[in-house]
């Protein structure tokens, strides 16, 4: 498997979301940040907009729910047709139950952790998930600087995967660009969320291809 690139529409033009999805049709996933103004201070889009995007684009939808009460709100995104639905470990006392409901509704289940959240308390439940999303910025706003300290979490999980102890995709979100993607790939990331590095480029499609090449060139596990 090669590196997966997931452009984040948080950096796109919200007045032209259908067009903005189309210009990154070569991407592996389309990363959609859902924020409720409670779990994080920002407010973005919700289920109706995601449903419209799903109807307009064939790119697998990677929904990142930065919201309270994912127990209630996560399954409807799976039911709508999202490929992967990620909620935050910090937002629920029943992450395994939420993952089960997401999978039952037809999507892959992801669990996300903020930069300051220790990963160790969640290692035992990772077999219930398809994706681990490691935040490399504080969730809520795009354009922040990459926090390299989170790569220790990536390395921990990569060792487990390489040892055959776990099957999961490692995704990273925040501050990913042409330089930081190499650090993340070397640490063991599989999927890279990129906002400004894609939508801030003159040619977003070419930016996706360039990021994919850079990650694949330096990653031992992605070159296998």
UniProtKB/Swiss-Prot annotation:
GO biological process: pentose catabolic process; pentose-phosphate shunt
Enzyme class: isomerase
Annotated metabolic or biological route of this protein: Carbohydrate degradation
Active site (catalytic residues): 33, 173
Cofactor(s) it depends on: a divalent metal cation
Keyword Cytoplasm part of the UniProt annotation: no
Keywords carried by this UniProt record: Carbohydrate metabolism, Isomerase, Metal-binding
Gene3D superfamilies for this protein: Aldolase class I
InterPro entries (UniProt xref): Aldolase_TIM, Ribul_P_3_epim, Ribul_P_3_epim-like, RibuloseP-bd_barrel
Record: residues binding a divalent metal cation: 31, 33, 64, 173
CDD domains associated with the record: RPE
Binding positions (substrate): 8, 64, 140-143, 173-175, 195-196
Signal sequence region: none
Lineage top rank: taxon: Bacteria
Reaction(s) catalysed (UniProt annotation): D-ribulose 5-phosphate = D-xylulose 5-phosphate
Free-text cofactor note: Binds 1 divalent metal cation per subunit.
GO molecular function: D-ribulose-phosphate 3-epimerase activity; metal ion binding
Family: Belongs to the ribulose-phosphate 3-epimerase family.
Function: Catalyzes the reversible epimerization of D-ribulose 5-phosphate to D-xylulose 5-phosphate.
Protein name (Swiss-Prot/TrEMBL): Ribulose-phosphate 3-epimerase
Species this chain originates from: Mycobacterium leprae (strain TN)
The organism's taxonomic lineage, starting at the top: Bacteria, Bacillati, Actinomycetota, Actinomycetes, Mycobacteriales
Gene of this entry: rpe
């Amino acid at each position: 498997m090669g590196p997966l690139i997931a452009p984040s529409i948080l950096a796109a033009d919200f007045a032209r979301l259908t067009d903005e999805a189309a210009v990154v049709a070569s991407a592996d996933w389309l990363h959609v940040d859902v924020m409720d103004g409670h779990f994080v201070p920002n407010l973005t889009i919700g289920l109706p907009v995601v449903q419209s995007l799903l109807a307009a684009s064939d790119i697998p939808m990677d929904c990142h729910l930065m919201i309270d009460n994912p127990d209630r709100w996560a399954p409807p995104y799976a039911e709508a047709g999202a490929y992967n639905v990620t909620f935050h470990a910090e937002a629920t006392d029943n992450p395994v139950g939420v993952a089960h409901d997401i999978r039952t509704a037809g999507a892959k289940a992801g669990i996300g952790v903020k930069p300051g959240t220790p990963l160790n308390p969640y290692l035992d439940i990772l077999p219930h998930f398809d994706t681990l999303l490691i935040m490399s910025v504080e969730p809520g706003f795009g354009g922040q600087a990459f926090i390299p300290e989170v790569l220790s979490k990536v390395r921990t999980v990569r060792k487990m995967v390489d040892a055959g102890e776990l099957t999961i995709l490692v995704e990273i979100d925040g501050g990913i660009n042409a330089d930081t993607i190499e650090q993340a790939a070397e640490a063991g990331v599989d999927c890279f969320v990129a906002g400004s590095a894609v939508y801030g480029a003159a040619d977003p499609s070419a930016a996706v291809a360039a990021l994919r090449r850079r990650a694949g060139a330096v990653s031992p596990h992605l070159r296998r």
